[in-house]
Amino acid sequence: MVKLRPKQCGRKQRTYRIVAIESQSRQEGKVIKEVEFYNPRREETQLDILAITTLCGSGVKLTETVCNIFRRATFKIT
């Protein structure tokens, strides 16, 4: 099963990339597609809405953390 989940970047000042990745692989595992950049310190997000909608249409599941990030970015998923 493929999921959208955050992948950590940086050591001291953490930022995250929201990636499509196999659910059983490690957090640093092979990425299928990167769809978002999220910086929690600045509350900054960069979305690739077309990629997100196509992935969700193909059956990709969202983790709870990613749903919360999308809500904060005022992006609704049906």
UniProtKB/Swiss-Prot annotation:
It holds the Pfam family Ribosomal_S16. The gene is rps16. Coiled coil: none annotated. InterPro entries: Ribosomal_bS16 (IPR000307), Ribosomal_bS16_dom_sf (IPR023803). NCBIfam families: S16. One of its GO terms (biological process) is translation. One of its GO terms (cellular component) is ribonucleoprotein complex. It comes from Adiantum capillus-veneris (Maidenhair fern). HAMAP family: Ribosomal_bS16. The keyword Plastid applies. This is Small ribosomal subunit protein bS16c.
